């Protein structure tokens, strides 16, 4: 599992990868974001890693680079015919994601448990 990351905590639950970005969505180095996104995308290509849940419970804000990184991971999973979603966003984050129409592409679940269950449902 990916344990050396600074921005994301990565967990695997059955065939679902749960990533939890932590801290300030603008308080990171671009190189770290790019490197970690690529590491997670590589992990998602491995057998047994099909679905993706992005847990936003620790985020209050993120900038365009961060959104782009999340979208690249979500899109890759969806393009392979697997499930991807968001969960646990606060009211401010929900507004940002709704304004960007991202929920038309990937659903949002109120709790992490709901998201993991939905992702794993065949």
Where are each of the predicted segments found?
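Short acidic-hydrophobic, aromatic-tinged amphipathic segments that line or gate anion-handling sites
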Residues: 105-115
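STAS-typified acidic loop motif
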Residues: 2-39
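General structural signal for secondary-structure boundaries
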Residues: 11, 63-65, 114
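Amphipathic alpha-helical interaction surfaces in cytosolic regulatory modules
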Residues: 25-106
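A short, charged, amphipathic alpha-helix used as a generic interaction element across diverse proteins
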Residues: 115-122
């Amino acid at each position: 599992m990916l344990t050396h990351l600074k921005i994301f905590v990565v967990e695997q639950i059955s065939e679902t990868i749960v990533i939890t970005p932590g801290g300030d969505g603008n308080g990171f180095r671009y190189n770290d974001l790019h490197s970690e996104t690529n590491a997670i995308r590589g992990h998602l290509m491995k057998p047994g890693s099909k679905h993706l849940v992005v847990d936003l419970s620790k985020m209050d804000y993120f900038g365009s680079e961060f959104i782009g990184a999340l979208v690249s991971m979500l899109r890759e999973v969806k393009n392979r015919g697997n499930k991807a979603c968001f969960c646990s966003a606060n009211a401010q984050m929900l507004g940002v994601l709704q304004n960007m129409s991202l929920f038309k592409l990937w659903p949002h679940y109120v709790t992490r448990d709901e998201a993991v269950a939905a992702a794993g449902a065949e």
